[in-house]
Curated annotation (Swiss-Prot):
Entry text on domains: Possesses 2 methionine sulfoxide reductase domains (A/MsrA and B/MsrB) and 1 N-terminal thioredoxin domain. The domain B exhibits a thioredoxin dependent methionine sulfoxide reductase activity; the Cys-495 is probably involved in the reduction of MetSO and in formation of the sulfenic acid derivative. The regeneration of Cys-495 is probably done via formation of a disulfide bond with Cys-440 followed by its reduction by thioredoxin.
EC number: 1.8.4.11, 1.8.4.12
Gene behind the chain: msrAB
The keyword Transport belongs to this UniProt entry's keyword annotation: yes
One Pfam family here: Redoxin
Domain Thioredoxin: 17-174
Active site: C207, C495 (nucleophile)
Note: The domain MsrB is stereospecific for the R isomer of the sulfoxide of MetSO whereas the domain MsrA is stereospecific for the S isomer.
Family of this protein: In the N-terminal section; belongs to the thioredoxin family.
Record-annotated disulphide pairs: C68-C71, C440-C495
Protein name: Peptide methionine sulfoxide reductase MsrA/MsrB
Reaction equation(s) it catalyzes: L-methionyl-[protein] + [thioredoxin]-disulfide + H2O = L-methionyl-(S)-S-oxide-[protein] + [thioredoxin]-dithiol; [thioredoxin]-disulfide + L-methionine + H2O = L-methionine (S)-S-oxide + [thioredoxin]-dithiol; L-methionyl-[protein] + [thioredoxin]-disulfide + H2O = L-methionyl-(R)-S-oxide-[protein] + [thioredoxin]-dithiol
Source organism per UniProt: Neisseria meningitidis serogroup A / serotype 4A (strain DSM 15465 / Z2491)
Any one of the GO BP annotations: protein modification process
Amino acid sequence: MKHRTFFSLCAKFGCLLALGACSPKIVDAGAATVPHTLSTLKTADNRPASVYLKKDKPTLIKFWASWCPLCLSELGQTEKWAQDAKFSSANLITVASPGFLHEKKDGDFQKWYAGLNYPKLPVVTDNGGTIAQSLNISVYPSWALIGKDGDVQRIVKGSINEAQALALIRDPNADLGSLKHSFYKPDTQKKDSKIMNTRTIYLAGGCFWGLEAYFQRIDGVVDAVSGYANGNTKNPSYEDVSYRHTGHAETVKVTYDADKLSLDDILQYFFRVVDPTSLNKQGNDTGTQYRSGVYYTDPAEKAVIAAALKREQQKYQLPLVVENEPLKNFYDAEEYHQDYLIKNPNGYCHIDIRKADEPLPGKTKTAPQGKGFDAATYKKPSDAELKRTLTEEQYQVTQNSATEYAFSHEYDHLFKPGIYVDVVSGEPLFSSADKYDSGCGWPSFTRPIDAKSVTEHDDFSYNMRRTEVRSHAADSHLGHVFPDGPRDKGGLRYCINGASLKFIPLEQMDAAGYGALKSKVK
């Protein structure tokens, strides 16, 4: 507690620490005004949000969107929590952000939500997403805990269950990882699942406050966590790392969407903000804990990192001193270090985090791994086989009708010639000749290759009337079809989850057994 108070005072009065004394780079101070901003807003039923905000309680906020199926499936559960006496020690509210992150415009959202039946769910509307932006909320659902004094105490990305929510209210530093939850189906699934097709790399580049905040701003990064890596002791504290020579490096665990970013992309972003020739020093921070390094868990990544280092070396006369090593250990830093620059908007940082907003030149992508199929019969494999061969996201989407995040799959912006087949059975479904950029965030087509390859079903969920599209052979959930497509091409828009598909490039169609369909592409 003494150590935390020391850091709080330094953040408040601008102290320069002997260890971790960073050059000042002021970040968005909006996080400090979250309580005031909340109190000025109204709910979806036009009540003052202040009705739900008692000053003597912490506030637990759930951020959600109308286009997020997981969010919609949890509305009833969240409404029950808001009425449950177990949650009476906190203000429990939800925030929707019309006009932000592809949410409906304010009027359209109000009209849409009025058709739902959650009369006891506090839904505060923040037009433009001022609060979400100030807290770096980039995925839904996400949660934020605001203390009694108005300070941001914790941000959690993804779905949490009741036990986790209560633990968070009791202790902002609670270890939520020990309480299992499922991302897609929290009521039925028994094991954790990943938000997207995620991969993880560990980056050491000086003071982890700035590096964490920097990567949180990058589109395609799902999460960034500060911690201590590759040291000689277990479960070190900040004091251990700083004063007791444990050998750990301040490191950020970066989890990213591999369908949007490759490891090489991540490394390009990394080298933008570190001096790779500086040994045990970044900015004003000096010591072995501030050394630079890239630590991997997949041996195949060593060569990728080596190639990036070789390319980077060409920019410098001095030799690079960035470690390229396997991850030996990693321990999360104390909770007060997590999201530090959000909790302390005037805190110091040795890098310019605005560089995260600059696009990469020649951005590369990581292609999804291919899956096998029976080209002769297009039969659906057994459930055990599907769980073995599909990613968690592919399984949840095709088998449990889940939906991937909008703009999250590389197929949304893939327009190379070829065909798209059912990832489950290999059945041909759509051609690149019929694909177009609808702007909705999911791969869109004007028609299937063969009308008989898909089936249509009424879907009345979430106060909507939609037409679900499934594959014929394997009955895989694909997406929905809407009557708002290009008029000159039939007027239909097949809005399809990229996770349901496998792309076969034109030049590979013969070898893959689809040569007879090349005329559908050309």
